[in-house]
């Protein structure tokens, strides 16, 4: 499974990358929105994991861009601030799941293993 991980916080990005690569996921990492979009232009991903707050935009913008391009990857938001308003906005932009930081590696990998992007709009789960 090919995963795009977009996270600006270095320690969180490295922790998530280690978590995924140890379980044999192929991971591309980006530190900001623009780099994430650049990856979307060049590669196909089965899943996108994006921080909500990025230095040059938001995870919402990344997922919106992916959906505009017809990308139907599983989309997981990660954030230190899982407020109900965040969940509402995620449902509108195509996130399937929202995970609070620090992300539990086993839980994340179980979502990746069990879930697939659905046809049509995603329903958000917390």
Q: For each predicted feature, which ranges?
A:
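Two-component/phosphorelay signaling modules centered on CheY-like receiver
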Residues: 10-28
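Acidic, metal-coordinating helix/loop segments flanking the phosphotransfer/catalytic sites
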Residues: 29-47
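Short amphipathic alpha-helix used as the core "switch/output" element in two-component signaling
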Residues: 60-72
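C-terminal output helix
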Residues: 103-116, 120, 124
């Amino acid at each position: 499974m090919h995963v795009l991980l977009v996270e600006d916080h270095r320690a969180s990005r490295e922790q998530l990358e280690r978590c995924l690569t140890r379980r044999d996921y192929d991971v591309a990492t980006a530190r900001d929105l623009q780099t994430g979009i650049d990856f979307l232009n060049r590669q196909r991903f089965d899943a996108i994991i994006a921080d909500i707050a990025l230095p040059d935009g938001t995870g919402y913008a990344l997922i919106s861009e992916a959906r505009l391009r017809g990308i139907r990857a599983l989309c997981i938001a990660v954030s230190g601030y899982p407020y109900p308003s965040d969940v509402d906005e995620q449902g509108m932009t195509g996130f399937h799941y929202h995970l609070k930081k620090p992300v539990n590696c086993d839980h994340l990998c179980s979502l990746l293993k069990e879930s697939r992007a659905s046809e049509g709009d995603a329903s958000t789960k917390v």
